[in-house]
Amino acid sequence: MEDAHDQSSRPLSFELESNHHSLRQLTPPICTSYPSNENEDVSQSLLPAPLNDRYPPISSQWPPGTIQQNPSEDPHQQTESEVASQTSWQRRQTTKSGSGLRRYPTRRINLVQGSVLSVDYPVPSAIRNSVEAKYRDSNDATAEEFTHLRYTAATCDPDDFTLRNGYNLRAAMFNRHTEILIAITYYNEDKVLTARTLHGVMQNIRDIVNLKKTQFWDKGGPAWQKIVVCLIFDGIGPCDKNTLDVLATVGIYQDGIMKHDVDGKETVAHIFEYTTQLSITPSQQLIRPQVDNPDNLPPVQMIFCLKQKNSKKINSHRWLFNAFGRVLNPEVCILIDAGTKPGHKSLLALWEAFYNNKHLGGACGEIHALLGPRWEKLVNPLVAAQNFEYKISNILDKPLESAFGYVSVLPGAFSAYRYRAIMGRPLEQYFHGDHTLSKKLGKKGIEGMNIFKKNMFLAEDRILCFELVAKAGYKWTLSYVKASKGETDVPEAPPEFLSQRRRWLNGSFAASLYSVMHFNRIYKSGHNLLRLVFLHVQLVYNICQLTMTWFSLASYWLTTSVIMDIVGTPSATIKNKGWPFGNDASPIVNNIIKALYLAFLMQQFFLALGNRPKGSQTSYILTFLYFAIVQLYILILSFYLVAQAFSGGNIDLDFDNGAGGFVGSFFTSTTGLVLIALVSTYGTYIIASILYCDPWHLLTSSWAYFLGMPLTINVLNVYAFCNWHDVSWGTKGSDDTASLPSAKTMKSVTQKSFVEEVDKPQVDIDIDFECTVRRALSPWQEPKEKKEVQLEDSYKTFRTNLVLLWTLCNGLLALLINNDSVRNLCLTTTSTDRTAWYFKVILWATSGLSVFRFLGALWFLGKTGLLCCFSRR
């Protein structure tokens, strides 16, 4: 570990290892039918390399549809389809020849330090020729990064990915300073979501490169050489293979070159490196440079890390910070989830926050929901509610915490950290949640944690934020950057929504308790007295929030009951009438609503304890609808209270004793408190949104959020706490083992280790690339999810309904017998009379059943004795 720190602290001082140069020198010369300079005619080329018309217009039909090829020349054409993409991809990994039975020649690849396999592969001609000449021929660039894809089979733990062990990255090999390291973490997103993120990142890099009056980016080399983009895919099995075609089209991936193991030592991560100017939009349009166009994308240094096994997001971050970060030593690391699209100049705004504040350790931008064309997704109440929730969080919560200097959570989907700020204890605590370190850490790792700590690591970003602010001897702060915006997709169906919020709620609750219980560590930091005062104020605020969350279930029920009783129950004292159904009907309707409220709430416990959300969608949808209706009813009653109060109606406010009497009654009466709560809640939403010049969510999404407020308490909180034992990430997928070839080493005459690698001709590389581009640019079709209810789900659903029916019947009987409020529905007027009658019925029924059983026993005994006398011997 010390060696890793030493080397990461001086990434520009080491000499390039001769092994790496020898690898590049051993790369065979390119044999291709493509033109090698820009003056040659390419009208007959297989792919429209951007040379004949100097970058022809962008078209989604690249390569042109007029190209015909014999199916026998493409060994993969027969198997390409949405259904068989996994099988087809595996088949391409083991294919050794591109046409017929012809075998390719091989070349020797020397291993770095005798153990590290790192190979340079020629890229397709169309990709190589798409690089602008001003970059390709520049003295500041190295031609190899545009002509060859570098592949490294990392057979080590991320902590062992060091220069001493023979691992290196191109940006460090070329002695480049990395100012920004942008990490895109991926699980199983489709190619549209991935392209949305990657293209948005490349557009943001163009914004930085095109800065004109800058005192920083123009010094010490071109700006694009100071930025590295790292894509980290969490496992071969879960990843969408169509997404790999998109990456292959822009040049940062190739089929058939990955190795499952090196001499039996399994590959942990497959690392690809390439510098590209190509990009694909979410609509599958290929973006290529055009002649002297200032809007061209600059070269982008790419690292693609494809982990062999699914090992969760924390492990992906360990590859980022402990492996790539130590080699590149960036100033700022920006974290983006696949599917999140950074807005215009958003990454620049994040970086500027660090550049202008030397004590800033972490920052986040504004995340808003993806609403689709013409905001069509707002029709979905779940999407609309989440959109409003995100907006209010960005308008009220994040600015408040930023003012204190401690943002409790920097969303992993769109945030940034100063690399040297999180080094040390913050990352050490953060990585305790990595499952791959469980054996190494022992009791300090995930296996030695109790269920509370395991839930805490479901919101591991909160732990990192607290550890960063509390870092001993430093005064790092966290901030919210309003100018930086990111757009992300949100769950659109109840099962995905419940699974996501279960992880968020349990993780944030546990992490909040962690920060409160360990607040004394703040005193060891380097914060000044004023900052400590702010942090103490925030501590009190967080404790109040935790307390409100803990008692929210009872609080909402009591609030609902009180409002219904105030408005619906007639009172002789203040001479008000029952509303809205009159004196007689209003209490009855309210009691029915309360009974159903408790019934649906009870149902949530049964569903949460025994059923999967996917197996109980209908029950959850009915629950959502009912609680939304109840909330609408309560809102109507609340605004009726407001109208009555300001119109001088018969509400418990003092209008007869002047302003003093009115103010006194306003702050002491139940009606006044309801009015204060309404104005302070909804009023702050409206005023703050207008002040931030962002009021549109009030018109488009507030309806869904306000109607869905009881869902957060009665459904989400119940589901989260009932599944406290579940410490999974609530995602789907599996660890499919891909069949990749192995690398076997041999010894040369000089006893140097080498492997023999297929030396594929450039023509065959280009033919395979044509097929890849066709797959990548084909229109995306959303997969149709099979709505099949598993047999186990059907059993659990029946079990839940049976227990619920049994409980409700017993509860309803107890309510009817023992509650005075339902006297209008019964024959008697008091619960005492009903209880007496019920007690008599129970006694008579018990006695009758006992006598009946006794008579049956007597009959059996007499019958047996009588038959015994007359039975045959």
UniProtKB/Swiss-Prot annotation:
PANTHER family named in the record: CHITIN SYNTHASE
Biased composition (Polar residues): 33-46, 58-72, 80-98
CDD domains in the cross-refs: Chitin_synth_C (cd04190)
Gene name tied to this protein: chsF
A GO CC annotation given for this chain: cell septum
Catalytic activity line of the entry: [(1->4)-N-acetyl-beta-D-glucosaminyl](n) + UDP-N-acetyl-alpha-D-glucosamine = [(1->4)-N-acetyl-beta-D-glucosaminyl](n+1) + UDP + H(+)
Enzyme Commission number(s) from the entry: 2.4.1.16
Enzyme class, UniProt record, top EC level: transferase
TM region(s), chain numbering: 532-554, 588-608, 621-641, 672-692, 702-722, 802-822, 841-861
Keywords: Cell membrane, Cell wall biogenesis/degradation, Glycoprotein, Glycosyltransferase, Membrane, Transferase, Transmembrane, Transmembrane helix
Main location: membrane
Listed name of the protein: Chitin synthase F
Compartments where found: Cell membrane
Ranges for region Disordered: 1-105
Organism: Aspergillus niger (strain ATCC MYA-4892 / CBS 513.88 / FGSC A1513)
Glycosylation sites: N506
